[in-house]
């Protein structure tokens, strides 16, 4: 049986004037239309092709070599292209737009909005469907991340405390406001770092390396910018936090620690209005 909403490796069983038929096992033969057959891939009988399986507008299984923006079981930020009496329709990179039923909305959507969704397969109809109700699809088992571990983040929701983000397509985490030193919005994908896994299971995140690695990374960044600017930067431990954030994406406190260490190592000189290489 083919995995609907996922990539499948299927064998070519028949050529026709309008496409190739692939062996879908218990689902029978699945059509790969001519328009989805690249000229540079083999397509002889018994060849195996890597294709994405979905339902067409008549709810028939169809194969494509086009790449959707998200597969079943994954989270993504998708653009609303239409809202009608049936529900909200999202652009996910395939000709047939993805349905987000009204019952799966968290807020009212209009065309042009972006929405972070999980994509699942309806058990009764096998239709690929989106939901904005994310909690039920995130892992509730205790996470085993280590402090400082690099992870993939999908920023999902702004809160009073910062931004909730999905970690490695599995867990909720929180980027606290004091860890954010650049523009952020829901739907952004970022590299992040585990700051803390609390006893209650909640996970704190950072957008910068943490611990000793963070200090080393920031020190290297400061030295790099100094070398790029003839050994001088018009920023110091007395500078406005906004200037420091715009230059290095860190808090003033972390910046002061870094230049203090560089000063002790004899690599820079600190003035009231600038720092210089020695």
Each language-model region and where it sits:
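Single-stranded RNA-binding regions, centering on S1/OB-family and related RNA-binding modules
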Residues: 1-278
